[in-house]
Amino acid sequence: MDNPVTNAAVSTVADAATNAGTVFNGLDWFVIALFGLGMIATVWYSMRKKNESGKDYFLSGRDANWLQIGSSIYSSNIGSEHLVGLAGAGFVTGMAMAHWEMHGWLILVLGWAFVPLYDRMKIFTMPEFLELRFSRGSRNVLSLLTMASLVLTKIAATIYAGDVVIRTLLNVDSVNLLGHNVDIFWVIALGLAFTTGLYTIFGGMRVIMYTAVLQAPVLIFGSVCILYMGLHVLGHGSLADGWKATLSAAGKNVHLVRSIHDPDWPWLAILPGSAIIGFWYWCTDQYIVQRVLAGKNQQESRRGTILAAFFKLTPVFIFLVPGMVAFALTQTPGSGFTTGGDAAYTSLVAQGDAAYTSLVAQILPHGLRGMVACGMIVALMASLGSKFNASATLFTMDFYREWHPTASGRTEVIVGRIATAAIVFIGICWVLVIKSLHMPLYEYLQNVQGYLSPAIAVLFALGVFWKRATAPAALWAFVVGMLGGFGRLAADLIIARPINTLKGITDGNLSMLNYLVKGSVNVAAEKTQQIKDQIQEATSQMASALPLVKDQLAIKIQCLQQILGGTGITPDQYNEKKTIVEAALPALKTQLHEQWGLIFSFQQNIHWLYYCEGLLVVTAALMIIISLLTRAPDPKTVKYTYYGATPEEKAATRASWNAMDVVLSLIVVAVIVLFYIKFW
C-alpha cells in the first residue's frame, strides 16, 4: 500500500532536485529570521557582563557551568569535518571514519585525569603547562605551532565548509554586486569571517559559551530529523526497511574494522592511530581544552566533559549515517535524489561533500529546512569563533603577557580584541591564497595536525604521568617529533602532489575527464583547458621538485599531454588516451623511486597512520632515554604532574565527583563498546 507521507517526501526529493526555487520558501526564511533574532538576543545577553580582565575575556571569568562547557565543546567540535567531511566519508567509505567519532572515552580522560591538574595550575593555555612542567622554550614552540595550525588550516577549512554548505542550500554559484557577477564563495567567506569575528572580538569566550547552549540542541534535533526522514523515504515509510537498505547499499563498508591489508583503513593503523590523534585533540589542544579551563570548579568542568562525551556519541548517527543514507538514495532507481549534479559525471568524493546539505535541501519539509540550515551555519560560526578566540588567547597570554608582565587586565582585553581582529584578517587573506592553489596542496596541509600530534601527545602524557621526565628530554623529543612530522609532510608535498595531480587526471570517476565524454563540445572545450592548466601546473611542480629527473620525466609528461587532442573527444578517443596515460604512470613512479629511493618508499608504502604510530614510539623512547640520562627534574616542577597534588588538593578533587558521575561515564564507555561489537 502506498504511504502518502513517503510519496510526498519522494515528490519533495524529485522537485527539489529539479527546481532550485523550492529549496527554501517563506516559512524557511521566517524560521531563519527568527533564529537569527534569537542569536542576536543571546549575544546581547552574554555581553552584559563586561570583560575587565584576560580571565573574563579568554575564560569567561572562569564561571562557566557544566551545560555551557559541554555544549561549547560539542559546538566547537562540530565544524567542517562533520558537516562536510564526516557525511561525505559516510557516503564514500561507510563506517570507516566512525573510529574518530567514538572517542567520547577520551573526553572522559580529559575530565577525570586532566581537569584536576589543569584546575590546580590555573593556566590559560596548554603551552603554559609545558613551561611550568618543562621550560619556556617548549611553551614557545607549541604556542607558535598551534597558532599556525589554527590560522593556516582549521580556520580556512571551516570557511571552505561554509562555502559548500551555503552554496548547496541556496543552489547559487554567483551573485550580482554593483553590476558584477561575484563568486558566491567570496560572499560566504567574508560574511562568515566578518560576522563571527565581530561578536568574538567584542564578546570573547563568554559569548561563545552562551551561544553554544542555543546551537547544540538545534543542530542535534535538526540532524535527527534528517536521519529520520532519510530512512523514512529510503524504506518507503518503514524506518527498519530504510536501515536495511542503507546497510545493503554500504556492503562491506558497513564494517568498522577493515582487513590489515586494506589500503586505506587497515585496522592496525586506524585503531591506535586515531587514538593518538584523539588524545592530542581532546586532552591537550587549546581549541578544545580552553572550554574546560573556563569552568567554575572541577565539578562543573568534569560534568561538562561527561555531557560532551554523551554528545560525542551522536555524530556517527546524525552525520555519518545520513551520508550512508544519501549514498543508498542515489543507488535507488526513481528516488530522484541527487548530490550535486549528474552522478555519472561527478566524482564520488564531490558527491559525498554535498551529501548532507543535499539531504537538507531535498528531504526535509519546509520549516525544518530553515531550522536545520540555521543549525549548520551557526555550528560553523561557533567552530570559527572558537578558533579565533583560541588563537588570540595564545598570542596574548603566551607572548604579550611575557613581553609586558605588568600589563593590566583591561590592557589584556584590548590586546586580545586586536589580536582577534588581526587573526580574522589573516584568515581571510589566507583563504585568498589557498583559493588560488590546487586543492591537493590544501588537503596535505590539513594533515599537519596528524603528523604533529604524536610529539605533542608524548610531551603531555609523559609530562603528566611520569615524574622523571626532564626539560632537556622534552625539548629534544619535541624537536625530533616535529622534524619527523614535517619530514613526512614535505614528502607528501614534494612527491605525492605532482603524482596525484597527474594520476587524478586519468581517474574515470573524476568530473574533469568525464565531462569530456558527455558530447557537449562547448563543455568539453572548457574542461579541456582546465585539464591543460592542471597538467602544466603538475609539470612545473615536477620540474621544480625533482630537477634530477627532469629529462627522464619529459617523455612521460609528453605522453600525459597527449590527452589534450582537440576541443572535444569521443568516448573511444577518451578510452584510448586514458590507456596511454595509465601506461605512462608506472614508469613515472619507477623513475621517481630510483631517484628518491627511501623518501619515495616512505611516502608511497607507509600508511600515514602507521607513520603516526611509529613517530609516537620513537619520540617516547627518545624522551625516556634522555630523561634517564639527565639530571632529575626540579621538585618544584614535579608538582605539576598527576601525582603532585597535596592532600588538600586530593580531597578537593574527591569531593568534586559522586557516584552518578561515575555511572554516567560508564554508560558512555558501554555504548562505545556495544557500537564496536555491533559494527565490528
Q: Where in the sequence are the language-model features?
A:
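Membrane-embedded helix-loop-helix hairpins and adjacent transmembrane boundary segments
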Residues: 2-680
